[in-house]
């Protein structure tokens, strides 16, 4: 019989490196699953009865953007639940929920059903921000930049590989089976998270939860955190503004070429490849010199790369500049996330990261709209000048926010 005075056995410490590895695979699978269906999304919309060029463009834009819109709405709710119930259960909820929705998408019979399911996908999403929150609350603070930079490469890798694999699968098996394959990938993500990610979390009752006002009052620097949310949104606006016109711009540069799709795909992919290489290294550098310096410096360098993109004469020149731009962009969101974790406690990390995700989703919606509007009125090249101005504003805005409190005060 155990003596009453015998000390309790402490639980095994969390192996944060293993959790980081498994979360990376989860983000990779999630990124791949989302991008698997992107190459043929307009084609699938067409099979659901949408005809006519204008109608097809409108519905394709709607089914693409509605996911981000509903994700922005739902993220704060899921973030609050993560702070109450734990981050692992939110990862499981997201992976399983998205898997079920993907199956239903494969059975959609009309465009309205598909649109509703795309909205539901946004409502049930949130794997990546919850993975960020989980890892951010477990890693040593002096390794935050490296760990979050490494984690970000998971989603980027999946997003790079997904369109290629999705296109091959669609050509081989048809459009609907790809949704079922995507659902299987997400279910695999659910199984891996269930068995291999560990979290020691004490659930918090609803009455003991901090409300939104108390969450911001608990932050070390609430104004800076709000500035970082806006910074995240503008980063996504700048990234997304180029997406609608990239293929058309490449066609303008390449002239009559037989392999336009291949060249455009390469130029679209090279920033992600560069981000894979740069994010962990710049994150590690940020741990040494401060993530705020990395953030502002990389945005300033991005401006210098965007301007000549408007002046290039060949696809090769554009590809080289986009590779360098990707190396800069790979450091931006991990630097923001590192600064967020410096300024919040583990108690509210789920909500802070979910608010940041909401701002990111707003940027994902508005960026392509900005690029399309500018190109329609002023031409493709003007988009790069406008995007450079947006990034320049973001660099100045971020620098101003960060100067209001020194780095050491943020991490103490």
From Swiss-Prot:
Disulfide pairings: none
UniProt membrane topology term: Multi-pass membrane protein
Protein localization: Cell inner membrane
Cellular component per GO, a single term: plasma membrane
TM region(s), chain numbering: 20-40, 62-82, 96-116, 119-139, 150-170, 177-197, 225-245, 260-280, 294-314, 382-402
UniProt-recorded Gene Ontology molecular function terms: transmembrane transporter activity
SUPFAM superfamilies: MFS general substrate transporter (SSF103473)
CDD domains xref list: MFS_MdtG_MDR_like
Keywords: Cell inner membrane, Cell membrane, Membrane, Transmembrane, Transmembrane helix, Transport
Xref: InterPro entries: MFS, MFS_dom, MFS_MdtG_subfamily, MFS_trans_sf, Mutidrug-R_MdtG, Tet-R_TetA/multi-R_MdtG-like
Family, per entry: Belongs to the major facilitator superfamily. DHA1 family. MdtG (TC 2.A.1.2.20) subfamily.
Protein name: Multidrug resistance protein MdtG
């Amino acid at each position: 019989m155990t003596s009453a005075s015998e000390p309790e056995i402490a639980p095994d410490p969390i192996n944060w490196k293993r959790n980081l590895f498994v979360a990376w695979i989860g983000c990779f699978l999630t990124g791949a699953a989302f991008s698997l269906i992107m190459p043929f999304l307009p084609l699938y919309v067409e099979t659901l009865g949408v005809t006519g060029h204008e109608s097809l463009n409108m519905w394709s834009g709607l089914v693409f953007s509605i996911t981000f819109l509903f994700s922005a709405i739902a993220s704060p709710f899921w973030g609050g639940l993560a702070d109450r119930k734990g981050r692992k259960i939110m990862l499981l909820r997201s992976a399983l929920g998205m898997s079920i929705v993907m199956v239903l998408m494969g059975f959609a019979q009309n465009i309205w059903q598909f649109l509703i399911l795309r909205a539901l996908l946004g409502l049930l999403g949130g794997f990546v921000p919850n993975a960020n929150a989980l890892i951010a609350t477990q890693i040593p603070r002096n390794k935050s930049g490296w760990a979050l930079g490494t984690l970000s490469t998971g989603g980027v890798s999946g997003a790079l590989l997904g369109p290629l694999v999705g296109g091959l699968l669609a050509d081989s098996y048809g459009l609907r089976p790809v949704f079922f394959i995507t659902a299987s990938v997400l279910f695999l993500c659910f199984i891996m998270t269930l068995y291999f990610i560990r979290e020691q979390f004490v659930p918090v009752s609803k009455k003991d939860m901090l409300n939104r006002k108390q969450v911001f009052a608990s932050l070390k620097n609430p104004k800076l955190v709000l500035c970082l949310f806006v910074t995240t949104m503008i980063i996504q606006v700048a990234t997304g503004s180029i997406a609608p016109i990239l293929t058309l711009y490449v066609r303008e540069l390449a002239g009559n070429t037989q392999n336009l799709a291949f060249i455009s795909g390469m130029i679209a992919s090279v920033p992600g490849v560069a981000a894979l290489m740069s994010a962990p290294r710049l994150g590690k550098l940020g741990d040494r010199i401060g993530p705020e310096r990395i953030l502002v410096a990389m945005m300033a360098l991005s401006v210098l790369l965007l301007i000549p993109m408007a002046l290039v004469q060949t696809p090769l020149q554009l590809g080289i500049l986009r590779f360098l731009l990707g190396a800069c962009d790979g450091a931006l969101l991990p630097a923001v996330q590192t600064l967020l974790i410096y300024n919040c406690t583990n108690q509210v990390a789920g909500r802070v990261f979910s608010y940041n995700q909401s701002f990111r989703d707003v940027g994902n919606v508005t960026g392509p709209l900005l690029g399309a509007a500018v190109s329609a009125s002023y031409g493709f090249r003007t988009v790069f000048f406008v995007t450079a101005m947006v990034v320049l504003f973001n660099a100045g805005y971020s620098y101003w926010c960060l100067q209001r409190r020194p780095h050491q005060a943020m991490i103490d």
